[in-house]
Amino acid sequence: MRPSGRRADELRPISIQRQFTKHAEGSVLIGFGDTRVLCTASVEARVPPWLRGQGRGWVTAEYGMLPRSTHTRSDREAARGKQQGRTVEIQRLIGRSLRAAVDLQALGERSVVVDCDVLQADGGTRTAAITGAFVALTDALEGLVRQRALPASPLHGQVASVSVGVYRGEPVLDLDYAEDGEAETDMNVVMNDAGAFIELQGTAEGHAFRRDELDRMLALAEKGVGELLQHQQEALAT
């Protein structure tokens, strides 16, 4: 039995609120159960120096957690003087995932920076960030189309992400904090709407996982991502 009482293949309640802030070209407050992440997408009329003059755009991401997003307060990374390795890893993952859905040539020489700030953490912050960031990015790019800065959106598909793992010997979908702390295996999966995998991050914590467990986890991830893609579509339709 999972601590939340959910079935092994059941997502936490998902909420996606668009236009959560007024200044960013795209902004989303996403909830995976008690995890809350604010995702804002900002359009900049410039690209990194190594891309200048190539006619291509760039999509990148930054990630951070509020000091009291967890059970006990953590110092801001700015106060420590540097980012933690976990932060750098996660924001690179978010950026890679979003770029997989964008035709950077069609974007032109401009950048979209997506900031993902964890307001409340209860497991799955990076997967929630990717799923919400895609919606914020979509709104930002559609804004460029409305302004006639682009003839069409450079998006060529959807992207969403979910965690899976082995908890008390059973593969489960969308781990919360209580499960994540005890999981024998923890895996983050990023997929597109064509059913293809963009990234897999998996680690055996308690014991090594078998091929049959991996197959069951990937099947759960496919199911979960399919449901998250539907949540994105419903949010974008409102």
Curated annotation (Swiss-Prot):
Keyword list, A-Z: Nucleotidyltransferase, RNA-binding, rRNA processing, Transferase, tRNA processing, tRNA-binding
Enzyme class, first EC level, given as a word: transferase
InterPro entries attached to this UniProt entry: ExoRNase_PH_dom1, ExoRNase_PH_dom2, ExoRNase_PH_dom2_sf, PNPase/RNase_PH_dom_sf, Ribosomal_Su5_D2-typ_SF, RNase_PH, RNase_PH_bac-type, RNase_PH_CS
Coiled-coil spans in chain: none
EC numbers: 2.7.7.56
One Pfam family it belongs to: RNase_PH
GO terms (BP aspect): rRNA catabolic process; rRNA processing; tRNA processing
Catalytic reaction list: tRNA(n+1) + phosphate = tRNA(n) + a ribonucleoside 5'-diphosphate
One annotated GO molecular function: tRNA nucleotidyltransferase activity
Binding of phosphate, residues: 86, 124-126
Domain of life: Bacteria
Disulfide bonding pattern of the chain: none
Record keyword Cell membrane present: no
Function statement: Phosphorolytic 3'-5' exoribonuclease that plays an important role in tRNA 3'-end maturation. Removes nucleotide residues following the 3'-CCA terminus of tRNAs; can also add nucleotides to the ends of RNA molecules by using nucleoside diphosphates as substrates, but this may not be physiologically important. Probably plays a role in initiation of 16S rRNA degradation (leading to ribosome degradation) during starvation.
Family of this protein: Belongs to the RNase PH family.
Self-association and partners: Homohexameric ring arranged as a trimer of dimers.
HAMAP family for this protein: RNase_PH
Name of protein: Ribonuclease PH
